[in-house]
Amino acid sequence: MNQSSHNLIGVLLVLILGVLLLACVVGAGLFVWARQEGLNPLKAIQLRINLERHEDELSRPAGSDPQYRKVEILPGDTASIIASNLLAQNLITDAGLFVDYVQYYGLDSQLEAGTYFLQQTQTLEEIAYALTDASAATIPFLTLEGWRIEQIADVIDQNPLLEFSGADFLRVVGPGASIPPDFKARNGIPDVMSNGQPPSLEGFLFPATYKLKPGITAFELRDEMLAAFEQYVTDAMVQQAAAQGLTMYEVVTLASIVEREAVVAEEAPIIASVYLNRLRRPMRLDADPTVQYAIGNTRDGTWWPQITQADYYGLSGVPNQSYSTYLNDGLPPGPIASPGLGAINAVLNPAVTEYFFFRAGCNNDGRHEFFTLEQQAEHAAFTCP
């Protein structure tokens, strides 16, 4: 064998050794890159490569619908079964990718049986981790300031995640429903209202975003909302009302009117001052929302209908006309809606004014024009150009 052949063999050996060394380095690197405890190294590499290829899908929601969907995981359900259920509800777009993700990150053994409430707007990664803790699953439930109890009932009927109806809820909060004695005493809720009817919990179902446990009953929802009222409307506020000669029932009743009138939050204390000034004089409140409450949904199917001046003194045949403060002196028999904390504080801490009248302003921004007794004629003549 000549010298050139020896040199060629040497070069080939070096190349082979280099390739083998490179393969070892690459293999070791892949092992380190994809290593996950409890996974076969080759399987880990395969899963990691697939996840890297679909990185965008992992962080992209399946859709834009914010509606919550109920997902049940039964004891013994595998990752594949769970993935199929998620795919069927359009919560993920790739069942296989979900299985690969939970296997690679060891979540497949942590997926917990239970009831979950998920959205299309969550990513696959977020859903995977959410399904490891059934105790954290809650039903979001929102009520707004200024709603009457029937509107809360309507929202219950629109929520497929709740297992009771709006009618069930009205039975535990409506007129004649049982009211916890301590709550009733604390807030000065009468046994019988001024119109001779039994009271309801109108006004005391605190408006907030609630996180409800799966399987909650109408009775339990009522208790959560009353507990929220007692949390935010403190004993100090009850005492403040008493110092002003008011029960919290009277404060909430007036605050419910202020809530419906005040579009701009900073005007709430001024509007409260108008009504308090009229009560002290005394003058009828002449509050439009009380007329709307009396009419209810009997006119156009909405709970707060448009009214005209003819409605101020023409509610013949309307069952709730005792709520109209154009027809009756003083406060209405009870609250007309759920006031927020701002409206309640406005009644407890009203602005100091000499206003007795107000009208909607002309800028369509929710603000009002206010008038004193001396400006009564100006108030009556006020019109927008």
Label the model's feature ranges.
Residues 1-283, 339-342, 346-354, 362-385:
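Conserved catalytic or metal-liganding residues and their short signature motifs at active sites
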Residues 311, 325-328, 344-345:
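Predominantly eukaryotic Lys/Arg-rich, low-complexity intrinsically disordered regions
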Residues 315-320, 336-339, 347-348:
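C-terminal catalytic domain of photolyase/cryptochrome flavoproteins
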Residues 328-335:
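Short, glycine/charged-rich beta-strand-loop motifs at protein surfaces that mediate ligand recognition
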Residues 265-321:
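Small-residue-rich helix-loop
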